[in-house]
Amino acid sequence: MKFQSFIKFFAIILLMQGAAFSADDEHDHDHSAHSDEPFYGHVGIRLHLDHVNDAGESDEEVNELYTHSHIELGSRIAEGLNIDTNLKIEGEPGGHNHGGVSRTHDGDDRIFEDHPLIVESLTLTYSHEDFSAYIGKFNPKVGLDYHSFPGLWSYSMIEEYKIAERIGAGLKYGTNLDDFGTHQLNISAFHVDTTFLSDALLDSRGHTSKEDGGLGNTEDFDSYAISLGGKDFYSLNNNIAERVSYRFGYAHQEAGTAESDEERYSASIV
């Protein structure tokens, strides 16, 4: 039954992809770019088929079919007011536990095994001119996101360092400096999601509570992040400048149970 449900959901993703929700390389994944549209979306699909023919343990020599895909949907519900969500199916090869689900090898082929369906973000955003304020569940902006890294397995690098699925609020301010690019400052305060949205469908991962501990799991808005990013530079003499983007970020996560506070920094130019 679970496999059938997964196939149905994946079929919906494919239909939406064919219905032109997908984006080309120039798509702007900042939903504020669509804030005047009544309905908008984006589909990202990764389908992996791995064959392991030589491993340290014989039960790891298997075939694996899995997907790491997402649907971003949004709607303008009033003047300057938008609601956005990101639904993600987080499949991984055996031995990985991204998404809060442990995946192990037992010698059998793994066909769409251990695929939690996650509400990774659900936000309400108010925008006025260059300012935006948002509240809900989101991934605090610190470093580069999925769409900035090339390669088939680039998403796994992001999973290792990103701060994800936090409850809180934030502010954004953007400015356009013409030939000197567009820039955006993003500031947010948050804590780990301990609501019903912390569980998953298809493959449950359980409900997160404060007692589980971990960074930012305080149920207070005492963790925070700040970042500055820019792109869209222009030069008559240098085509490289037009392709350059940057992001600098900092985050502080307050200690949960049996943890210490964490400070993290990010600097990138691509």
Predicted region positions:
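Bacterial N-terminal signal peptides
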Residues: 8-17
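Outer-membrane beta-barrel proteins
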Residues: 52-58, 94-98, 142-147, 194-200, ...
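Short glycine/proline- and aromatic-enriched beta-strand/turn motifs that initiate or cap beta-hairpins
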Residues: 24-70, 221
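Short loop/turn motifs that connect adjacent beta-strands in outer-membrane beta-barrel proteins
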Residues: 23-41, 73-83, 127-130, 176-186, ...
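Solvent-exposed loop/turn segments connecting transmembrane beta-strands
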Residues: 58-63, 90-91, 163, 179, ...
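Detector for outer-membrane/organellar transmembrane beta-barrel domains
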Residues: 219-270
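Outer membrane beta-barrel
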Residues: 62-195
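Transmembrane beta-barrel strands of outer-membrane/channel proteins
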Residues: 43-51, 85-89, 135-137, 185-191, ...
